[in-house]
């Protein structure tokens, strides 16, 4: 059985990156929530 985590910087950025978050309304809500909480890193 292969491992489920096969790291790839491209996939990581495309699914969880800042621009990916900004692209949807829900993604912007995620960023707003993380800003309100005071996270130093909003995205990966």
UniProtKB/Swiss-Prot annotation:
Protein family per UniProt: Belongs to the bacterial ribosomal protein bL34 family.
One GO term describing the cellular component: ribosome
Classification via NCBIfam families: rpmH_bact
Protein name: Large ribosomal subunit protein bL34
Domain of life: Bacteria
Region (Disordered): 22-44
Source organism phylogeny: Bacteria, Pseudomonadati, Pseudomonadota, Gammaproteobacteria, Moraxellales
PROSITE patterns membership: RIBOSOMAL_L34 (PS00784)
Gene Ontology biological process terms in this record: translation
Gene name of the record: rpmH
